[in-house]
Amino acid sequence: MTVVVLGCKIHGDRPSRMLHARLEAAAEFLLEHPQSHCIVTGGQGADEDYPEAYVMKNYLVDKGISPMRIVTESRSTSTLENITFSAEMAEIYNCHERFLIVTDRFHQYRAMRTANDLGIVSYALNVETAWYLAMPYWFREMAAITRDWITS
């Protein structure tokens, strides 16, 4: 199984609270499953100093995950690109074709649906988000799901 950690906002060279939770969940899984590889996926936002994927990889390495197990995908700017580019990286690096997608519960439906639409067998590793952080993102997700439904 290839662990795919979806990117999220960073602050300088540190993950945001939400990204921190995703990375903690991924690190725990990777430490318990040493045969699994990981793809960290996330580009660089206009207000970010680095691509999210670089910060994510550094965090996991600091947690004891070998850098040889981590593939960095730093071009993506959307959920669709996260999954699409991760699938490309999995093929290039001969990672397992099944994905364990690590993201917040509010984001998991769209991430899993995207993977399914691309023909990728995937499983969810949900991360809980504090309600006061999650509320605006739930509305954003509903808008994104509606947009995807209209444009598909």
Task: List the model feature ranges, each with a label.
Residues 1-138:
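A structural signal for short, hydrophobic/glycine-enriched beta-strand patches
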